[in-house]
């Protein structure tokens, strides 16, 4: 079957090296252990050509990159591959192309022992753990976030933890809560990277995850931001985004975790690919959950479909001068022509930009307006 991926062991010779017995059938090709490990490693490292060792630079002027670690299969695998890559560079040249700073965002249920295990395995890197509510503290002007708090708390002096709890509790749907949490997490990661001198963020998103994000962000009304959320390059936040695992399926990463030496399974806290089940209650089902379930099922037998979604989306280009557009106060993305709020994109005769501009610090893009309708309605009606 075209594009089929199977974990079933076979007695065939590896199609790549023609020497060893294959242990996996990956994208219709039987592959042995060594060739599969090399396949995943090469897919990631070829995306990092710009991070080669710079012999012209002083050793104390090493570039620094941030790796957000969720303890999932993708970010854990990326850390493992980068660690191997740096060790290889160090053994050959006594230098490395970059230094890794690992950030874990604590959303309230983080077990510190997880990070301790990672730090023990990969001891040559810097590590930090920040609570998600620190986003209210780290952003240069937290007034833009405070504008979305319930009115009863806007005038009060609340802790950052109370502000986050109040904001999330005020949202009316599971999709809205998941969307705002993801948005705040990204803002926190970006701000930490900038404040610690990182020039790039290496996201662990796999092909499968990028495909999920493509359809989810489009469905939520934030499709205009896809060139920045899917492709490698300069982000609107004046820091580079890279997706080294963009050519590797999530299912392949789970296979890699099991076959890596030493095994990575003890460091990964995520259900096996394909195990995601949408909630039986539509009230508790998010758009992200549905997209995750869909693409994890598709990649089982038709990985080419998943790859085509990402490949096609990757062709989208950022319009000239887009970064000079007004920004959404929540997600921070440049909004085309400042068309804020529901009316800005609704196809009706109401103006979005002028109405939204009336509220200081509260201008929301269409997607964020859908997640925070109370504030979005207020913005559009002023």
Curated annotation (Swiss-Prot):
Protein name: Cytoplasmic tRNA 2-thiolation protein 2
CC per GO annotation: cytosol
PANTHER family, per the entry: CYTOPLASMIC TRNA 2-THIOLATION PROTEIN 2 (PTHR20882:SF14)
Keyword Cytoplasm set for record: yes
Pfam families: CTU2 (PF10288)
Function: Plays a central role in 2-thiolation of mcm(5)S(2)U at tRNA wobble positions of tRNA(Lys), tRNA(Glu) and tRNA(Gln). May act by forming a heterodimer with NCS6 that ligates sulfur from thiocarboxylated URM1 onto the uridine of tRNAs at wobble position. Prior mcm(5) tRNA modification by the elongator complex is required for 2-thiolation. May also be involved in protein urmylation.
Recorded superkingdom: Eukaryota
Coiled-coil ranges per UniProt: none
HAMAP family xrefs: CTU2
UniProt-listed InterPro entries: CTU2, Rossmann-like_a/b/a_fold
Principal location class: cytoplasm
GO biological process: one example: protein urmylation
Species whose genome carries this gene: Phaeosphaeria nodorum (strain SN15 / ATCC MYA-4574 / FGSC 10173) (Glume blotch fungus)
Pathway terms, separated by semicolons: tRNA modification; 5-methoxycarbonylmethyl-2-thiouridine-tRNA biosynthesis
Subcellular location: Cytoplasm
Family: Belongs to the CTU2/NCS2 family.
Alphabetically ordered keywords of this record: Cytoplasm, tRNA processing
Keyword rRNA processing applies: no
Gene Ontology terms, MF aspect: nucleotidyltransferase activity; sulfurtransferase activity; tRNA binding
